[in-house]
UniProtKB/Swiss-Prot annotation:
It comes from Rattus norvegicus (Rat). PROSITE patterns: FN3, IG_LIKE. The modification Phosphoserine is found at S585, S627. The keyword Glycoprotein applies. Promotes neurite outgrowth in hippocampal neurons. May play a role in redistributing DLG4 to the cell periphery. This is Leucine-rich repeat and fibronectin type-III domain-containing protein 4.
Length: 636
């Protein structure tokens, strides 16, 4: 008989193992093997003393903190090839002894900053074969000092936590292959002195920045920790930026060039160093001069060519680099936008295009035309300064001397919604950049501006309010006297006009439409009446003909007293009495003439129906009446 203590231990051990799993108690370690068991979640009754837990090849969809709570002795956790789409925050929070975590072959799309919190002694992290598109910058912070192997291959990553990866001094193997990575930060691997394998295969890398890490693989015997580097399957752009890599002379790799076209498809290490060349930047087109009104958006464009693609910068009039701000935006393609221009934005801007082969510059002139502001006058030269429309009208009313020599402003050809503004040529001694028309109406006090080229002497105002009074002033914008002055504004004249009231254009059209409608209606009534009358006559004639059907008599023989009487002689049939002559007979007699008359009647009716609308407007109506009478006489 077994001792009671041994039976108790066996019973407790059997109860601790989940039913679908296999538990192995090898020496002091306990392994729980639950692979290929069809599990939908982590078994809740797993022994908390488990050292190795294998849950691979199941259908687990999510992980949460209760799944591994109090499993402080767990060293190896395998969750490969499940259907995990979500890892809750601090799901591994109690796994302080965990050394190996396998999450490959799942459906993870994102790793948050707290998804992997807890395993501070983690050494091997396998995340390959998921659908990861983003890994939070702080996702690896708990095991930066201990991690030795990191595998994030076969995902959809464009970026990885480079700052965290660059701070892993114990990292030996880094697999980044088969992702969408298109750039490596310069010097990102400088601190990885223990790195022995770096796999960058099948990404989107067109170039690689120089890094001391790559030179360790050139001489494996001299390097304390030789590097196995693989970056084949990338669209390498073989120009001067990769000349440093070409000089490493690694004959064991099979990389090829994807561009430029002259080197596409050639073996990378077989291309002579002299063919790894670059082209200096060349400004292809740019804005030369731009004039905008104060407050408008200004767009300065600059396009450059070169190999590699030049980096674009802008320098403002104050010789400072123009960066993105709340008012200005510098785009990578060389476009500079200023949202709301002011007088201080005017000046010369410099577009700078740079690449490793050199730089190119272009000058762009921005002129900001200041709008008139109320209360500002210029005493120099006797010219009025910037002024709004109220001040301009007041100045015109006071009769300043400057207006007497200026041409008058006239508004002619005024309609309900438009008016033609005309003015004469200005004084030849005064250069004019452009004219500015200011106007507002009694219906809306909003001041409206219109800019007219200096070569014009008239302007058509459109979209005016019907029946409204307008005040209009014309100003000339001229160059300032000094480089630091604002644009000079000179008043040419003012005018007052009123638009015509809105005229209902539908009266004449209404009479015309009503006349046409009445004609069509009367014609329709007459046509309908003629149709009804004709059908009635045809029906009446057919009924009369059926009543006069001739009776056909057969010969009758009579037999009396059983005797037979001789057959009477046959007499020739008597001809029917003559009938009165008619134009047409509708009985069942001779119908040949009726058919001809019907054809004539149908043709006349077709001709008359085609000309009914014309007959309604003239003698046709009278002709139609006469035809109807003749038709009645011929049928009845």
């Amino acid at each position: 008989m077994a001792p009671p203590l041994l039976l108790l231990l066996l019973a407790s051990g059997a109860a601790a193992c989940p039913l679908p799993c296999v538990c192995q108690n090898l020496s002091e370690s306990l392994s729980t093997l639950c692979a290929h068991r069809g599990l939908l979640f982590v078994p809740p009754n797993v022994d908390r003393r488990t050292v190795e837990l294998r849950l691979a090849d199941n259908f687990i969809q999510a992980l949460g903190p209760p799944d591994f709570r109090n499993m402080t002795g767990l060293v190896d956790l395998t969750l490969s090839r499940n259907a995990i789409t979500r890892i809750g925050a601090r799901s591994f929070g109690d796994l302080e002894s965990l050394r190996s975590l396998h999450l490959d072959g799942n459906r993870l799309v994102e790793l948050g900053s707290s998804s992997l919190r807890g395993p501070v002694n983690l050494q091997h992290l396998i995340l390959s074969g998921n659908q990861l598109g983003r890994i939070a910058p702080g996702a690896f912070d708990d095991f930066l000092d201990s991690l030795e192997d990191l595998d994030v291959s076969y995902n959809n990553l464009r970026q990885v936590p480079w700052a965290g990866i660059g701070s892993m001094p114990a990292l030996h193997t880094l697999n980044l292959d088969h992702n969408l990575i298109d750039a490596l930060p310069p010097g990102v691997f400088a601190q990885l002195s223990q790195l022995s394998r770096l796999d960058l295969t099948s990404n989107r890398l067109a170039t690689l920045a120089p890094d001391p890490l790559f030179s360790r693989g050139r001489d494996a015997e001299a390097s304390p920790s030789p590097l196995v580097l693989s970056f084949s399957g990338n669209p390498l752009h073989c120009n001067c930026e990769l000349l440093w890599l070409r000089r490493l002379a690694r004959p064991d790799d099979l990389e090829t060039c994807a561009s430029p076209p002259t080197l596409a498809g050639r073996y990378f290490w077989a291309v002579p160093e002299g063919e790894f060349s670059c082209e200096p930047p060349l400004i292809a087109r740019h804005t030369q001069r731009l004039w905008v009104l104060e407050g408008q958006r200004a767009t300065l464009r600059c396009r450059a060519l070169g190999d590699p693609v030049p980096t674009m910068h802008w320098v403002g009039p104050d010789d400072r680099l123009v960066g993105n701000s709340s008012r200005a935006w510098a785009f990578p393609n060389g476009t500079l936008e200023i949202g709301v221009t002011g007088a201080g934005d005017a000046g010369a801007y410099t577009c700078i295009a740079t690449n490793p082969a050199g730089e190119a510059t272009a000058r762009v002139e921005l002129r900001v035309l200041a709008l008139p502001h109320g209360g500002n006058t210029s005493a120099e030269g006797g010219r009025p300064g910037p002024s709004d429309i109220a001040a301009s009208a007041r100045t015109a009313a006071e009769g300043e001397g400057t207006l007497e020599s200026e041409p008058a402003v006239q508004v002619t050809e005024v309609t309900a919604t438009s008016g033609l503004v005309s003015w004469g040529p200005g004084r030849p001694a005064d250069p004019v950049w452009m004219f500015q028309i200011q106007y507002n109406s009694s219906e809306d006090e909003t001041l409206i501006y219109r800019i007219v080229p200096a070569s014009s002497q008239h302007f058509l105002l459109k979209h005016l309010v019907p029946g409204a009074d307008y005040d209009l002033c014309l100003l000339a914008l001229s160059p300032a006297a000094g480089p630091s002055d604002l644009t000079a504004t000179r008043l040419l004249g003012c005018a007052h006009f009123s638009t015509l009231p809105a005229t209902p254009l539908c009266h004449a059209l209404q009479a015309h439409v009503l006349g046409g409608t009445l004609t069509v209606a009367v014609g329709g009534v007459l046509v309908a009446a003629l149709l009804v009358f004709t059908v009635a006559l045809l029906v009446r004639g057919r009924g009369a003909g059926n009543g006069r059907l001739p009776l056909k008599l057969s010969h009758v023989q009579s037999q009396t007293n059983g005797g037979t009487s001789p057959m009477p002689k046959s007499h020739p049939p008597r001809s029917p009495p003559p009938r009165p002559q008619r134009s047409c007979s509708l009985d069942l007699g001779d119908t040949g003439g009726c058919y001809g008359y019907a054809r004539r009647l149908g043709g006349a009716w077709a001709r008359r129906s085609h000309s009914v609308h014309g007959g309604l407007l003239g003698a046709g109506c009278r002709g139609m009446g006469g035809s109807a009478e003749r038709l009645e006489e011929s049928v009845v």
